[in-house]
Amino acid sequence: MRIPRRPIRKALLAVLGLALFSIAGSAIAQSQDDPPNRVARLSFLRGDVSFQPSGDDDWVQANLNRPLGTGDRLYTDHDSRVEMEVGAATLRLDAQSSFNILNLNDTAAQTELTQGVMNLHVRRVFEGQSYEVDTPTLAFVVTQPGNYRVDIAPDGSSTMITVFSGTGDVYGENNASYSVRQGESVRFHDAALQDYEVLDIPRGDDFDSWVDSRNNRYEHATSRQYVSEDVIGYADLDDYGGWNDTPEYGHVWYPSQVDAGWAPYRSGHWAWVDPWGWTWVDNA
């Protein structure tokens, strides 16, 4: 397991079977000390992905279904990729990417990418919500649905923002701002947003193809007919079972296979997730 070469700047969790999270669309009245309702989930892992929980000094191997929150960090090694679900949005990292969750609450999902490539696919945005990606040179803010890509130059000197669909705003030093619209790809060479290039969207690479295949999985999931897209993990239901109508309960999901002697809380592990405490993380 490889540790990042340079430094990189927590929602009551209910996990049952596939670690589904129900996210309310409207904010629930909370006291100032209550944790946020929104949490991220590691929904796909491939290769060697390192994880540093908030407040820890050590890096460990990332686990599927792990809940993520403010202060958590990820690093993808060579030939590795990772996917995270945050409500009706999905974040994906390509190989050799350094990622940090700066702030995750009911309205804001502020992240940081200091190395590598990231795709942000937003299916829906509730009023007052935003998604932000900070890089070494700028901040990219999304407040509407769309498909976005962020590339950091190998030396960290520039950031390229690509908007496949939607619109996003870039912010830099001295209150500088720039709107990147659908069909545009802009490379920013400085933090003041004075030195930039407007480019045609590059030909899609292997990472883009993978992102498209994952997006299609979500968009064509049968479970979308029965479960809100805001339920984290809804697409996984298609992989492990199907839906039937019952006179008493209506639409009911049934697992396709149940091992003999199955019981809850056997296939997985308990993890301490601050500030919510011990949380069951399923292996499915």
Each language-model region and where it sits:
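Bacterial N-terminal signal peptides that target proteins for export
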Residues: 2-14
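Bacterial N-terminal signal peptides
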Residues: 13-23
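A short, compositionally biased domain-edge/stem linker segment
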Residues: 25-32, 230
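Flexible, surface-exposed loop/linker segments and immediately adjacent secondary-structure boundaries
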Residues: 29-169, 174-185, 220
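Low-complexity segments
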Residues: 126-128, 173-177, 181-284
